[in-house]
């Protein structure tokens, strides 16, 4: 609905003002929309962010057209929107920080291991864990040896199904997230970074903990 509203706002500005600024703003919004919806490999909220300045300008231009004596009232909805935006930012920060914290905990836990520590997935955890020597699991180029550790982040991508008869479970680590808002948690419909996780830029719901499964190769 927000997307429809933005497009309607753009076309309304073009129809009413018919000036160079309207054309520029229209191309800005429509160009970003076409790229994000039709050319990017995945529909994500962040690919729509480049149109944010243009949308803000369109909103201000729309407010200027209002001649109502209560014109200031149009700004009141921005206050709760600002609060929600800040809460979303905090939730997203906490989600990102769990990757760094999980990496720190696993480093302390397995730094004395004689075998190799392998990790699945991508994104932040992949980056932080590699800094202390964990290796990405790629069965086409390397096979874990007996006694090696494999860490599997649940809320992640490109996970490899491990044969149960070849590994033994050691532990499941959980890290708490922001309690009722998330931008990218599997099963909540929130897919800010990729629509593969869901169609929503964020979700207000009960947010499960980030989980990391740890197994040892038999």
Give the residues covered by each predicted segment.
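Catalytic lumenal/periplasmic loop and adjoining terminal transmembrane helix
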Residues: 39-41, 65, 69-206
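Transmembrane-lumen/periplasm boundary regions of multi-pass, lipid-linked membrane glycan transferases
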Residues: 1-17, 37-38, 84-94
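Hydrophobic/aromatic-rich transmembrane helices and adjacent perimembrane loops
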Residues: 1-9, 22-26, 30-67
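Sequence-level motif detector for i,i+2 pairs with an aromatic at +2
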Residues: 29-31, 120, 209-212
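Membrane-interfacial loop-to-transmembrane alpha-helix junctions, especially the N-terminal start
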Residues: 14-28, 73-74
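C-terminal functional modules
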Residues: 200, 210-217
């Amino acid at each position: 609905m927000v997307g429809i509203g933005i497009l309607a706002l753009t076309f309304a500005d073009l129809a009413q003002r018919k000036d160079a600024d309207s054309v520029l703003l229209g191309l800005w919004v429509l160009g970003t929309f076409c790229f994000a919806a039709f050319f990017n490999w995945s529909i994500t909220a962040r690919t729509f962010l480049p149109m944010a300045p243009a949308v803000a300008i369109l909103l201000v231009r729309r407010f200027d057209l209002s001649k109502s004596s209560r014109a200031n009232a149009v700004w009141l909805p921005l206050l709760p929107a600002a609060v929600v935006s800040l809460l979303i930012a905090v939730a997203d920060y906490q989600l990102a920080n769990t990757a760094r914290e999980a990496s720190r905990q696993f480093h302390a836990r397995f730094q004395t291991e004689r075998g190799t520590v392998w990790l699945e997935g991508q994104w932040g955890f992949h980056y932080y864990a590699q800094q202390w020597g964990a290796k990405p699991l790629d069965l086409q180029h390397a096979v874990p040896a007996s006694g090696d550790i494999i860490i599997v982040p649940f809320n992640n991508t490109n996970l490899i199904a491990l044969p149960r008869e070849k590994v033994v479970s050691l532990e499941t680590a959980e890290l708490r997230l922001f309690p009722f808002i998330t931008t990218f948690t599997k099963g909540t419909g929130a897919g800010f970074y990729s629509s593969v996780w869901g169609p929503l830029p964020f979700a207000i719901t009960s947010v499960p903990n980030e989980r990391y499964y740890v197994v040892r190769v038999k």
